[in-house]
Amino acid sequence: MYQIPVLSPSGRRELAADLPAEINPHLLWEVVRWQLAKRRRGTASTKTRGEVAYSGRKIWPQKHTGRARHGDIGAPIFVGGGVVFGPKPRDYSYTLPKKVRKKGLAMAVADRAREGKLLLVEAFAGVNGKTKEFLAWAKEAGLDGSESVLLVTGNELVRRAARNLPWVVTLAPEGLNVYDIVRTERLVMDLDAWEVFQNRIGGEA
């Protein structure tokens, strides 16, 4: 059981959260690898010797020239020739069990909670879409830009106010994922986003 700090207009309080007690780094690595594989475009493509724009004519006779024997100029041995075993467009994605994905997400959030890097927010008071408003709020919340922050909220105005800052990554609650959690140093979520997260891991943590 973790005690998560909650920031509200009236002050700070704590919320008890049932998250995994043990963090499995390999499981987190598996989920991140799966995420990044899904993001790959897979459009790299090379031409084989049959696809390059050259004639298939033998460049000189097989014998009696004193030179090495060759076929057509599109052979891989020549500059500008085809490529042997080069990449072709492919899909790099693969399936990962849903239970593993849920556990990975729960563990990533638990890791931030264990480090004291998770902050829940009841309301972003005074933030109405302007970056300077978010900066003022962040200063009061103890976020000074020295650490990268993953901000998860369904409030479009808050996301708009924060997205311009190089040290903030903004996500909607449905977009919370292991990769963005582990690549940033702090995790800030509003209570609605926390509820969405709890529903996502529902009983599998």
From Swiss-Prot:
SUPFAM superfamilies: Ribosomal protein L4
Single GO MF descriptor: structural constituent of ribosome
GO CC field: ribonucleoprotein complex; ribosome
Keywords carried by this UniProt record: Ribonucleoprotein, Ribosomal protein, RNA-binding, rRNA-binding
GO biological process: translation
Pfam families: Ribosomal_L4
Similarity comment: Belongs to the universal ribosomal protein uL4 family.
Subunit structure and binding partners: Part of the 50S ribosomal subunit.
Role this protein plays: One of the primary rRNA binding proteins, this protein initially binds near the 5'-end of the 23S rRNA. It is important during the early stages of 50S assembly. It makes multiple contacts with different domains of the 23S rRNA in the assembled 50S subunit and ribosome.
Annotated protein name in UniProt: Large ribosomal subunit protein uL4
Provenance organism: Thermus thermophilus (strain ATCC BAA-163 / DSM 7039 / HB27)
Organism placement in taxonomy: Bacteria, Thermotogati, Deinococcota, Deinococci, Thermales
